[in-house]
Amino acid sequence: MFPLSGCWRTELLLLLLLAVAVRESWQIEEKSCDLVGEKDKESKNEVALLERLRPLFNKSFESTVGQGSDTYSYIFRVCREAGNHSSGAGLVQINKSNEKETVVGRINETHIFNGSNWIMLIYKGGDEYDNHCGKEQRRAVVMISCNRHTLAGNFNPVSEERGKIQDCFYLFEMDSSLACSPEVSHLSVGSILLVIFASLVAVYIIGGFLYQRLVVGAKGMEQFPHLAFWQDLGNLVADGCDFVCRSKPRSVPAAYRGVGDDQLGEESEERDDHLLPM
């Protein structure tokens, strides 16, 4: 009885430890973006955009602005908690003079949309204003612009709009290649002509080779189509270059020709008689 009771106690203790471990793992699991609206009615386009930004989930971006007592640091993460991990903040502002942390936007109220070369990520549900914007909750608007040369960078605050009664926001910008639309490669006219020319040359060589071998019955180099023409091509090119490029006129053959001794007849001595003195 006693050994059996001790065994049961050990098993219960192990189950209790396992339950505590599972509970702790659930608690420390990082939160992710929760789109505005009901879970089963989320926009497929927004879900696809968040999946597109997944390579940035494990990155943290920080930027510091101002000087003196008005120096603020902004920490931003994509679909991950920034700053105090229990706050659910996606973007926080830290006052460097007193290290006070203000939540600008939370990831549990995320809205996202895009254009041809940009993505707009919005975190709502930040800490309430004290005396501005009707004491509404803060909101962070991050403009992610296309930059094909970097995965992510150049995170900077642009401005804070708090002069209105409502719909105030903090505006930020950053660069990322993930915001770029896919490049569509088009063949140029020259490339198309080159492909056509290469295809015609291949058809000419293969077709001519088969014809020479199967129909004519040629062997060896004679199987190459129009072999005599290609062998004489160099001379033809040289003649054409000589005809087109040379500016010096060609030597014109003489209009007369020499006469050989065998073509000369015997001259009569009477031809010179009139030269003798009388």
Swiss-Prot record:
GO molecular function: protein domain specific binding; retromer complex binding
Membrane recorded as keyword: yes
Listed Pfam families: Man-6-P_recep
Subcellular location: Lysosome membrane
Ranges where the MRH domain occurs: 31-182
PROSITE patterns in alphabetical order: MRH
Membrane spanning residue stretches: 189-209
Membrane topology: Single-pass type I membrane protein
UniProt-annotated glycosylation sites, renumbered to this chain: 58, 84, 95, 108, 114
Keyword field contains Hydrolase: no
Residues in the Cytoplasmic compartment per record: 210-278
Residues with Phosphoserine modification: 268
Signal peptide residues on this chain, from the entry's feature table: 1-21
InterPro entries: Man-6-P_rcpt, Man-6-P_rcpt_cation_dep, Man6P_isomerase_rcpt-bd_dom_sf, MRH_dom
GO CC terms: endosome; late endosome; lysosomal membrane; perinuclear region of cytoplasm; trans-Golgi network
Cysteines engaged in disulfide bonds, as pairs: 33-79, 133-168, 146-180
Renumbered residue ranges of the record's region Disordered: 256-278
Topology Lumenal: residue spans: 22-188
Function: Transport of phosphorylated lysosomal enzymes from the Golgi complex and the cell surface to lysosomes. Lysosomal enzymes bearing phosphomannosyl residues bind specifically to mannose-6-phosphate receptors in the Golgi apparatus and the resulting receptor-ligand complex is transported to an acidic prelyosomal compartment where the low pH mediates the dissociation of the complex.
Subunit record text: Homodimer. Binds GGA1, GGA2 and GGA3.
Domain notes: The extracellular domain is homologous to the repeating units (of approximately 147 AA) of the cation-independent mannose 6-phosphate receptor.
Miscellaneous notes: This receptor has optimal binding in the presence of divalent cations.
Protein name according to UniProt: Cation-dependent mannose-6-phosphate receptor
Species this protein is from: Rattus norvegicus
Lineage, uppermost ranks: Eukaryota, Metazoa, Chordata, Craniata, Vertebrata
